[in-house]
From Swiss-Prot:
This is Leghemoglobin 1. Leghemoglobin that reversibly binds oxygen O(2) through a pentacoordinated heme iron. In root nodules, facilitates the diffusion of oxygen to the bacteroids while preventing the bacterial nitrogenase from being inactivated by buffering dioxygen, nitric oxide and carbon monoxide, and promoting the formation of reactive oxygen species (ROS, e.g. H(2)O(2)). This role is essential for symbiotic nitrogen fixation (SNF). Heme b binds at residues 44, 64, 93, 96. Monomer. Nitrated in effective nodules and particularly in hypoxic conditions; this mechanism may play a protective role in the symbiosis by buffering toxic peroxynitrite NO(2)(-). Nitration level decrease during nodule senescence. Phosphorylation at Ser-44 disrupts the molecular environment of its porphyrin ring oxygen binding pocket, thus leading to a reduced oxygen consumption and to the delivery of oxygen O(2) to symbiosomes. The gene is LB1. One of its GO terms (molecular function) is oxygen binding.
Length: 146
């Protein structure tokens, strides 16, 4: 069974909610560092800070991550697969030392953030839609990593 119109709509609506509050980006990175403190050095905008400090770069990167997952949902619905819009993503992830467990941490942080953002609109169906879209994006990035 492919990615459904309803799943795409669920991802789109919660993506819009995510973008409305800059604090959601801070929450996302706070969850990542709670799960994997050593990952701090992988993000240029966190390396030299105490904790997670809000910044334009942090906002931009979080929006890029969530936006790419949202784009994956759109692609899954349209074509059944995900093609990376940025061919350098594989190389960047290799350069930063990203390995499989990091994808799991980011996925958990993404799902927790979406749950928080969605409030009473959260459901297992919503979580599954984000999970499927993230997994497809992660697979495309891993493929680009070789």
């Amino acid at each position: 069974m492919g990615f459904t119109e309803k799943q795409e709509a669920l991802v789109n609506s919660s993506w819009e909610l995510f973008k409305q509050n800059p604090g959601n980006s801070v929450l996302f990175y706070t969850i990542i560092l709670e799960k994997a403190p050593a990952a701090k050095g992988m993000f240029s905008f966190l390396k030299d800070t105490a904790g997670v400090q809000d910044s334009p770069k942090l906002q931009s990167h979080a929006e890029k991550v969530f936006g790419m997952v949202r784009d994956s949902a759109v692609q899954l619905r349209a074509t059944g697969g995900v093609v990376l819009g940025d061919a350098t993503l594989g190389a960047i992830h290799i350069q930063k030392g990203v390995v499989d467990p990091h994808f799991v941490v980011v996925k958990e942080a993404l799902l927790k953030t979406i749950k928080e953002v969605s409030g009473d609109k959260w459901s297992e169906e919503l979580s599954t839609a984000w999970e499927v879209a993230y997994d497809a994006l992660a697979a495309a990035i891993k493929k680009a990593m070789g």
